[in-house]
Amino acid sequence: MAAKEIIFHDGARAKLVEGVNLLANAVKVTLGPKGRNVVLERSFGSPVVTKDGVSVAKEIELADKVQNIGAQLVKEVASKTSDAAGDGTTTATVLAQAIVREGQKYVAAGLNPLDLKRGIDKAVAAAVDELKKISKPTTTSKEIAQVATISANGEESIGQRIAEAIDRVGKEGVITVEDGKSLADELDVVEGLQFDRGYLSPYFINHPERQLAVLDEPFILLHDKKISNIRDLLPVLEQVAKAGRPLLIVAEDVEGEALATLVVNNIRGILKTVAVKAPGFGDRRKALLEDIAILTGGQVITEETGLTLEKATLQELGRAKRIEVGKENTTLIDGAGDKPNIDARVKQIRAQIAEATSDYDREKLQERVAKLAGGVAVIKVGGATEVEVKEKKDRVDDALHATRAAVEEGIVPGGGVALIRVKQAIAALAGANADQKAGISIVLRALEEPLRQIVANAGEEASVVVATVAAGQGNYGYNAATGEYGDLVESGVLDPTKVTRTALQNAASIAGLLLTTDATVHEAPKDAPPAAPAGVPGAGGPGFDF
């Protein structure tokens, strides 16, 4: 086991605070509409230019072991805030730095760190309660666009695209972000259920100009096994042919004689069919097939329920108004499933989301809910270069998360004003002793810091602006984008309540831990191996021999 080094008391805290400051100073330059860029070096490929606080934080590793511990703790603030609310990472970092900086002064002066922490916790709880009181629900598309615009560092086109996407697919719908193929941002909305499997043979295509196989008013056969023998399919094919409607077959695979026969019948115009593989794998495939069955009013033909292909009838087949099958995707539009059954299925999946332990499982379950309840919107981010698209994509992701947070918990005036307004509730608090009162005063000072940083990044005098905003009431604040004072909600400077709340709670949590730390244990630095003297054979210096 490697030797460890231990540092105690003020020496440990001072080093930790240095690490906090190094990371926070790099992150906080990105805050606000006039925040600056940070360039991140990459081992491979071109550098990344970003205004995304959490992207900057994640890149930072310090050479000094103890400083690095401090930096990693603040990095945790940014990551936790990003995970919970999707935005507010820079605000959380600024708040954490301010609480640590102010708290360190009191600890150095001999105050009890535990009482300081109790005072900090009491003040934060009061601030959160007050935030909830001043929060108002997000109701209009305009407010959603404003929240998204602020989170995207003031880019209105991103805000409009996100608001439009939510309008089209609803609050439950899936919105994904992809690289675009042009300079402009685009919105592509898929109505109905789409899954990532395409036709098994290009001979199924009947719209060559769009490279699609399109079926109007089709039956849908869902099977959880491979189909290779055409004899298994014949009974159901005959029934579909008599009904005079096309057929979509979704199975684990369709191959050999079965696929060849379907292709020949399709080319000759005897029976219009398309075969696709079932989406997903294992248990997830079964669940997705069941989703499609419920959405289309059909049943999955599976031995588990006693159904076989030979005995399948039209009653077991699903129906839809239209199906479009491309090379890589299949889209079912307007399935014939009963709404109560679909709602029950959505409720069941939501219960699974609540119990899911991994982010991946949760994300996939949410996708299934969206496909059943709403639709899927794809925002394609455009740009002139790969670096520009990557930077813009980060901002679109932030804006998307912020918008969802706003829909969830409502909005408060942005630009750091909400944190100034909650100071009144904290100022009235009484601590159990002088040290707790000092903890409360730490939070009172820290709550000004996001506004101070936004103003400083805009090149203005922070103290003057903070005093002017504090003298105002309600939504009155400073719009750093225009350099004017006024009603921030009216001018569209909004923050999701969840983002502001999460940033404050996470910052206070980690800052409290840092202030109550009295020792650090870290790996001792390794001594560098001595350099080989020049002239030694094989050492690579002058006079080496072969």
Swiss-Prot record:
Biased composition (Gly residues): 537-546
Entry keywords, A to Z: ATP-binding, Chaperone, Cytoplasm, Isomerase, Nucleotide-binding
GO cellular component: cytoplasm
UniProt keyword Membrane, yes or no: no
One annotated GO biological process: protein refolding
Region (Disordered): 524-546
InterPro entries: Chaperonin_Cpn60_CS, Cpn60/GroEL, Cpn60/GroEL/TCP-1, GroEL-like_apical_dom_sf, GROEL-like_equatorial_sf, TCP-1-like_intermed_sf
Single Gene Ontology MF annotation: ATP-dependent protein folding chaperone
EC number: 5.6.1.7
Stated family: Belongs to the chaperonin (HSP60) family.
PANTHER family per the UniProt record, alphabetical: 60 KDA HEAT SHOCK PROTEIN, MITOCHONDRIAL
Subunit composition and interactions: Forms a cylinder of 14 subunits composed of two heptameric rings stacked back-to-back. Interacts with the co-chaperonin GroES.
The protein's name in its UniProt record: Chaperonin GroEL 2
Organism: Burkholderia pseudomallei (strain K96243)
